[in-house]
């Protein structure tokens, strides 16, 4: 019995020894188990990063260079097409097309603050309506050159803006002060009128200009909604990563 028990004990010990994992096996099992492939994150760009990138784009000169590219193309088209049409016309937006609002954009940290005063620039906040009434928006020089080029070729220039009619005097004064003189008309949103989008107002105005006998050979704006809806032979979209108008 004693021998038998010893044999059995030896068998058990041998079995246990064979069953225990080796040091190599233990080391392998200590490695982290790879997780299943996770789907790509779908979050949009970080707002703070986007604002920093937009500021760098403006201040580095890239914005100005891109403006020059688009306006040069517009000018070349007007020179080519203008003499071929009996009553050629150019349509221009105002805000961040003919005049720059960068001072307000920066002061408001890219917010779109419509109401309130604007009396602390370069600090904010600055209400856009109050800013428009100041009539101090600087010119966008490349657009002014296109305007002057068009006028030298007897191309009629029409401004169509989302600004309300109540800002007409300040807007006309601002345009005149920076060099936009001799345009055919300034179309503004009637008081107490709401449009679902900028295009809902601007496209019908362009259609009315055509009904008056003009051929709109070019339309230029900084928002896709400035150009949507047709009634222009060639649209020219200026860069604007700073805000979006539907």
Where are these regions (language model features)?
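Non-catalytic pre-domain segments flanking phosphatase-related domains
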Residues: 2-4, 24-92
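Stable alpha-helical elements in mature extracytoplasmic
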Residues: 63-70, 74, 139-146, 167, ...
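Active-site neighborhood of HAD-like aspartate-dependent phosphohydrolases
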Residues: 82-89, 98-137, 152
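Bacterial N-terminal signal peptides
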Residues: 10-21
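Short, acidic loop-to-helix structural element flanking the phosphoryl-transfer center
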Residues: 130-158, 165-166
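C-terminal cap/substrate-recognition subdomain and adjoining C-terminal extension
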Residues: 30-34, 40-41, 45, 61, ...
């Amino acid at each position: 019995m004693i021998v038998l028990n010893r044999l059995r004990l030896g068998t058990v010990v041998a079995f246990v020894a064979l069953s225990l994992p080796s040091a190599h096996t233990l080391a392998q099992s200590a490695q982290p188990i790879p997780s299943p492939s996770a789907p790509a994150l779908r979050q949009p760009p970080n707002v703070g990063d986007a604002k920093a990138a937009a500021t760098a784009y403006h201040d580095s000169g890239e914005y100005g260079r891109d403006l020059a590219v688009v306006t040069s193309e517009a000018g070349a088209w007007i020179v080519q097409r203008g003499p071929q049409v009996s009553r050629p016309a150019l349509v221009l937006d105002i805000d961040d097309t003919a005049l720059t609002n960068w001072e307000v954009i920066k002061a408001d940290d890219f917010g779109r603050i419509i109401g309130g005063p604007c009396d602390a620039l370069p600090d904010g906040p600055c209400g856009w309506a109050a800013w428009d009434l100041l009539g101090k928006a600087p010119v966008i020089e490349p657009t002014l050159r296109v305007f002057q080029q068009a006028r030298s070729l007897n191309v009629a220039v029409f401004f169509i803006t989302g600004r309300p009619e109540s800002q007409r005097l300040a807007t006309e004064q601002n345009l005149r002060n920076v060099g936009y003189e001799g345009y055919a008309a300034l179309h503004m949103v009637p008081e107490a009128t709401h449009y679902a989008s900028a295009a809902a107002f601007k496209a019908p105005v362009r259609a009315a200009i055509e009904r008056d006998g003009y051929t709109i050979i070019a339309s230029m704006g900084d928002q896709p909604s400035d150009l949507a809806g047709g009634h222009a032979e060639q649209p020219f979209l200026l860069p604007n990563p700073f805000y979006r108008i539907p």
